Amino acid sequence: MISRLKTLSTSLAILGFLSTAAVPQEFDYVGDNHSWSLSCNASGYVLKSQYPVTRFFEAGAASSVTREKETLYLGRSCDASSTTMGEGKWCWANGGFFAEFESHRVSFPRQEPICPGSGRDSLACGC
């Protein structure tokens, strides 16, 4: 009986390892110490945070804090839009890419937005 339990335990441990080792990484980008997934549409790139992002918005007595999953839209014409930060711009350079808004900047150091089959569209938005 004990030998069967050891065999079962070993088998479950191996299966657990294999199941995590074979899962592809969906959140491939890191910006502002958060994990982001990247997808593309006809307008450009879409980055979605894996977990809620907490941001402080300074406005004197009317300052506020948000805590939610964010979506960043990086357009082909170098415009940027965010579900929490509003409108801005973005650009790419050898050191990575970033989106800049009125009160916040989200940087993705040493990374490049690339969508399968689209080539290097980010080069049009050089800093």
Task: List PLM regions with ranges.
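Bacterial N-terminal signal peptides that target proteins for export
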Residues: 1-9
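Bacterial N-terminal signal peptides
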Residues: 9-19
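Lipid interaction determinants
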Residues: 22-127
